[in-house]
Amino acid sequence: MEELLNQYRAMGISPAVYEYGEKALARLAERFAQIDRVAEYNQAKVIAAMQKNRVSAACFAATTGYGYDDLGRDNLEKVYADVFHTEAALVRPQITCGTHALTVALGANLLPGDELLSPVGMPYDTLQEVIGIRESPCSLAEYGVKYRQVDLLPDGSFDYEGIQKAINPKTKLITIQRSKGYATRPTFSVKQIGALIDFCKSIKPDVIVMVDNCYGEFVETMEPSDVGADMVVGSLIKNPGGGLAPIGGYICGTEKCVSRCAFRLSAPGLGQEVGANLGLMPALYQGFFLAPTVVASAEKGAVFAANLYEPLGFKCVPNATESRHDIIQAVELGSEEGMIAFCKGIQAAAPVDSYADPLPWDMPGYNDKVIMAAGAFVQGSSIELSADGPIRPPYAVYFQGGLTWYHAKLGILMSLQKMVDAGLVQL
């Protein structure tokens, strides 16, 4: 459509880049239809949970102070528990981010002398300090919790033999990171996670299994809690917040595990009874309601990105045809210059701070300089269109988000345009 092409041209996208994108898009009709089918199922699942728990306007009332008898907060946790098919849920704006939620879950369920096992290799950068892999005050290691790790096999599969040897009487909790994080391994499917949980529990039935579910919610019709996870943990400024939640995190799981998490978050004896919602309930409810369709938009953007960059010779994880289990698309660009150009394109497509110039910086919690592009309405929201990555080989940029598919499309086209303008790509 000439009118659309002119609008893109006015925003700095050349006809060559636009036409290259349209050719890629023409191949994706069935992939997009499949994504929409999953979104439709998950949308119905969320609505059913809200109806079952009789969500009403009364749930949107603000509370302050202690937050005793907070109807909206307590009911939202019932909705989450029903959607994730768990006994209980802790969904709070007092949880500041995904790393905080994971820290609460680990600290609540591990005691001095216990052992934590990761059977999927090194955890995400920020969690390394939480555990004590990298020294930090108040880490689990400082409190006497031991850590053991089993790396993935070279083909990215689980090392079942190594895991069997690693599980011992002191193994209290097993942590499984669903998403790739800043690695280039594949993200695990719910089915794969279920098989791993079954294997671990066949060796030690009472072991607690926690899944870091960040970036994975609503990408499939099932969640890790459907296949045996004792806790699933995530951030409300990622998938389940639907782009509307301004802060927050969640922990869904068994009554025992979640109850301990509540005591860790607030205080022993207080647990889930305190924690005012501060007027955030409308955003948290509506964001969760919108989340399945927002996640679908983000996933379409990831698929589109792989189908643009892979034919140009860049390694994409997942590749252009693989099934997807989170919203992250990794593209190995081979150089710092490529990462900067890509991120400048994402930033230039943003509705907020589009004029900003992303550059690598020393971000707290990371060992390497990190570049981030995110013109977001909620600071740090990675369900909104964003791209980031550590400045280290293989110089992979991690693209995720897009509250609407059309914004995700614009961002990817703009990233390619900046690569072309920098002389890093020829179409």
Regions flagged by a language model, labelled:
Residues 4-29, 46-52, 56-59, 67-70, ...:
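Conserved PLP-enzyme active-site core in the AAT-like
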Residues 31-35:
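Short N-terminal edge-element motif at the start of the domain
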Residues 39-43:
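Acidic, PIN/NYN-like endoribonuclease modules and their adjacent C-terminal/linker elements
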Residues 59, 63-64, 90-93, 327-332:
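Short glycine-rich or small-residue beta-strand-to-loop segments that form or flank ligand, phosphate
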Residues 64-72, 76:
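N-terminal small-domain helix-loop-helix segment of the aminotransferase-like
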Residues 75-78, 83:
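ATP-dependent carbohydrate kinase catalytic cores
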Residues 310-427:
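Conserved C-terminal alpha-helix-loop-beta "cap" of PLP-dependent enzymes
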